[in-house]
Curated annotation (Swiss-Prot):
The organism's place on the tree of life at top rank: Eukaryota
Species of origin: Arabidopsis thaliana (Mouse-ear cress)
Record field: catalytic activity: Hydrolysis of terminal, non-reducing beta-D-glucosyl residues with release of beta-D-glucose
Signal peptide, first to last residue: 1-22
UniProt name for this protein: Beta-glucosidase 1
Keyword field: Disulfide bond, Glycoprotein, Glycosidase, Hydrolase, Signal
PROSITE patterns: GLYCOSYL_HYDROL_F1_2 (PS00653)
The encoding gene: BGLU1
Residues holding a beta-D-glucoside: Q48, H145, N190, E191, Y333, E406, W451, F467
Family statement: Belongs to the glycosyl hydrolase 1 family.
Highest classification ranks of the organism: Eukaryota, Viridiplantae, Streptophyta, Embryophyta, Tracheophyta
Active site: E191 (proton donor), E406 (nucleophile)
SS bond partners: C210-C217
Glycosylated position list: N216, N221, N441, N473, N512
MF terms in GO: beta-glucosidase activity
Length: 517
């Protein structure tokens, strides 16, 4: 009951904040309502989809080591996309995808992260990209989706060491040279803020570094490494962006972006303290890396709070980082109520990212349907949360080009129930409708990618839940793919049908889906 009341509070607060935007839209819309050039796609990542972790010269990434050491579910086989990519591209074409987002496994392309290219890894990605292009699907490639080579972590501490900037730039150079004639959209780092917090502050994701006691880590320093790694990610991105502009852009005509995990923050009360805390949360989560990319330096509140533990950009570095991202990739699933806390001790007893931020964050997931909340209220919640985050980026950061690179709804992994995944359709309908509203309100949002095209190995969550438009039978050695109702809905939308919901629309959709199987 408390969760429901909290959600209702969130809806009321958002309605008050966005009364100027009008009602929660339930109007029909279609693909043609979006601007020409706006792209729709779906995505996967290498470790979550490929499998074949020890085939054809691939060597371990930090994910392989992290999961096997902890005896957790892993992506050793995952969807077996390495062997089934042609079948998957055919499904993408049948669905009507305009573009497809995927990542390259650094340790498959360059086994040790630097040095010689793995020829079989190179050929796989060439084949995959050519297959996409042959079917009229534009590749959108991420260079780093959490899974950097374990060799570099063992050799010099991975992202804690500036040496990785040179190695990452050399890896990107290979990708641009070998694939750039067919790839026009590159994202350097996926979810840079969450990769850093999870891997170096909390220690709950690879490489699993953090401060002890209080957390289960044997190495790391949450007080400093979180910010050092974030700094190195920004410098590596700037280095890669500079390389592309100097060596490839005139020939290939592509663009290079950077992606961040975005959360919609709302004050838990109308008190001044909570309003200030909400601004601080935005500065720590988004501004931490977005302000350097747009303005060339960290937010003032971070510099004041963190002090000497926050690395400093030299004048040259600031100039290189500023303006280095042609677009911002937004990963968006969550919203949160923020309460100010004057003293927020860390688990280890030393300052870390969470204690530096100085607030209590009650995260409410848009991924999980609260069944006791009326449908109309849930749709309003999704609608205004989406408007809120896109409006915030527009107003705070000069309206940069934005691609929503990940957004979707998880459901429990049940092959029978998942096939008719009506809650996912309702969620996607509300979210895409809100994106359309944001675009009409002036947001320079240029694309939307559903997460995920098919059920995947979900990072840290294994195979318990899934986001896919297509189900994958992970008990079947052949990993059979099957379309869900949401795949049918998304395909219809991409092919120009107006979205249709409500009881009559859902009944019609179920009927069409059943007859097409």
């Amino acid at each position: 009951m408390e969760d429901v009341l909290t959600l209702i509070t969130m809806i009321v607060l958002l309605l008050l904040a966005f009364h100027g935007f009008g009602k929660c839209s339930s109007d029909l819309y279609s693909r043609s309502d979006f601007p020409e050039g706006f792209v729709f796609g779906a995505g996967i990542s290498a470790y979550q989809w490929e499998g074949a972790v020890d085939e054809d010269g691939r060597k371990p990434s930090v994910w392989d080591t992290f999961l096997h050491c902890r005896k957790m579910d892993n992506g050793d086989i995952a969807c077996d996309g390495y062997h089934k990519y042609k079948e998957d591209v055919q499904l993408m074409a049948e669905t009507g995808l305009h573009t497809f987002r995927f990542s390259i496994s650094w340790s498959r392309l360059i086994s040790n992260g630097r040095g010689s290219i793995n020829p079989k890894g190179l050929q796989f990605y060439k084949n995959f990209i050519q297959e996409l292009v042959k079917h009229g699907i534009e590749p959108h490639v991420t260079l780093h989706h959490y899974d950097f080579p374990q060799y570099l972590e063992d050799d010099y501490g991975g992202w804690t060491n500036r040496k990785i900037i040179k190695d990452f730039t050399a890896y990107a150079d290979v990708c641009f040279r070998e694939f750039g004639n067919h790839v026009k959209f590159w994202t350097t780092i996926n979810e840079a803020n969450i990769f850093t917090i999870g891997g170096y502050n909390d220690g709950n994701s690879p490489p699993g570094r953090c401060s002890f006691p209080g957390r289960n880590c044997t190495l790391g320093n949450s007080s400093t490494e979180t910010y050092i790694v974030g700094h190195n990610l920004l410098l590596a991105h700037a280095s890669v962006s500079r390389l592309y502009k100097q060596k490839y852009k005139d020939i290939q005509g592509g663009s290079v972006g950077f992606s961040l995990f975005a959360m919609n923050f709302t004050p838990s009360t109308n008190s001044k303290d909570d309003e200030i805390a909400t601004k601080r949360a935005n500065d720590f989560y988004l501004g931490w890396m977005l302000e350097p990319l747009i303005y060339g330096d960290y937010p003032d509140v971070m510099k004041r709070t963190i002090g000497s533990r926050l690395p400093v950009f030299s004048k040259e570095e600031s100039e290189q980082v500023k303006g280095s991202s042609d677009f911002i990739g937004v990963i968006h699933y969550l919203t949160a109520l923020v309460t100010n806390i004057d003293i927020n001790p860390s688990l280890s007893g030393i300052p870390d990212f969470n204690s530096d931020m100085g607030e209590s964050i009650n995260i409410l997931s848009m991924r999980v349907r609260i069944s006791r909340l009326p449908n109309s209220d849930e749709k309003c919640l999704i609608f205004f949360i989406t408007l809120s985050i896109l409006e915030y980026i527009k107003q705070s950061y000069g309206n940069p080009p934005v691609y929503i690179l990940e957004n979707g709804k998880t459901m429990n992994q049940d092959l029978e129930l998942q096939q008719k995944d009506t809650p996912r359709i309702e969620y996607l309908d509300a979210y895409i409708g809100a994106v359309l509203k944001a675009v009409r309100n002036g947001s320079d949002t240029r694309g939307y990618f559903v997460w995920s095209f098919m059920d995947l190995y979900e990072l840290l969550n294994g195979y318990k839940s899934s986001f896919g438009l297509y189900s994958v039978n992970f008990s079947d050695p052949h990993r059979k793919r099957s379309p869900k109702l949401s795949a049918h809905w998304y395909s219809g939308f991409l092919k120009g049908k107006p979205t249709f919901l409500g009881s009559q629309g859902i009944t019609q959709l179920h009927s069409n889906f059943s007859s097409s199987r």
